[in-house]
Amino acid sequence: MSLNIEDKKAVVAEVSAQLAEAQTLVIAEYRGIEVSSMTKLRAQARENGVYLRVLKNTLVRRAVEGTPFAGLADQMVGPLVYAVSADPVAAAKVLHQFAKADDKIIVKAGSYDGQVLNAAQVAELASIPSREELLSKLLYVMQAPVAGFARALAALAEKQAEAA
């Protein structure tokens, strides 16, 4: 089903709005993927705050013009799924993890911070912990000495109470 010009303009505007707020765009090729698998991919993307769409490449090329993602335009060939996220690693993580489980999805390229990334670089980006994971690790590292000191004081107080 082809879109009329107004629908195409609306799609380009929607994608442009998503790209304006995004830090990362990852593209992956899909061939012969089952509907149930694509539905699972869409659900995982939604859970992780990733905007995921299958679009005409010409429409996406128009949407990326003048954005930091313009360098990906020459990679937009074939049946592609586009993952866009404001989180620097979420889009890469979702597509990379899904590609490991389903060989019909192949991560082709990505763009982060104005740089075009090849598939290996997208895999590296996907291996970086998310901001929330890093903050929780930092909090644990900061709390561990204080918690240990509190336990030592409690044990000392308990020992003195037994002695008295």
From Swiss-Prot:
GO terms for molecular function: large ribosomal subunit rRNA binding. Gene3D superfamilies: 3.30.70.1730, 6.10.250.290. InterPro entries: Ribosomal_uL10, Ribosomal_uL10-like_sf, Ribosomal_uL10_bac, Ribosomal_uL10_bac_type. It comes from the Bacteria. SUPFAM superfamilies: Ribosomal protein L10-like (SSF160369). GO terms for cellular component: ribonucleoprotein complex; ribosome. The keyword Repressor does not apply. One of its GO terms (biological process) is translation. Keywords: Ribonucleoprotein, Ribosomal protein, RNA-binding, rRNA-binding. Forms part of the ribosomal stalk, playing a central role in the interaction of the ribosome with GTP-bound translation factors. Part of the ribosomal stalk of the 50S ribosomal subunit. The N-terminus interacts with L11 and the large rRNA to form the base of the stalk. The C-terminus forms an elongated spine to which L12 dimers bind in a sequential fashion forming a multimeric L10(L12)X complex. Belongs to the universal ribosomal protein uL10 family. This is Large ribosomal subunit protein uL10.
